[in-house]
Amino acid sequence: MATAKKSTAKKASAKKTAAKKPAASARAAKTDATVLLQRDHADVKKLFRQYEKLADNEADGQERQALAMQICQMLTVHATIEEEIFYPAAREAEVEEDLLDEAEVEHASAKDLIAQIQAMSPDEELYDAKVTVLGEYVDHHVQEEENEMFPKCRRAEMDLAGLAERLAERKSELMAEEAA
């Protein structure tokens, strides 16, 4: 009985502290966090398609490497803003824990592959294969986020417009750090 009360109190407390949705008209005027993240997904998918064309045409190693590094940077920044801002907000709003746990494990796998790619020369064996597999990891991750996690986040009491602002600000900071 005491644990049931604690559990109920914990859920009530989490719901009180979770950022609330603004009015529908205010939401429409601003970008939603899931839309911002989906734009990142579309941008990186486009880069992977460009990389595939370069690899298929046996393009110069430097050109492939430059594009691979751009992909790695974009994914690193994207994963960071999700892990620092979006996932904690989703956890606070009590979005399905298993989805969030799996997303973080997928990020860890992608980061490992990113580190391998960044440490390689484009002329090394398996370079193109590693970039391709990274793209496959990302496709899987994106499908789960966009088809499962994001709809649940939209139904949860999350301030997606406020999160979008925080995500965009942090993304700008990280991109500036990378450029420096």
Regions found by a protein language model. Give the residues of each.
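Small-residue-biased structural context
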Residues: A2-A180
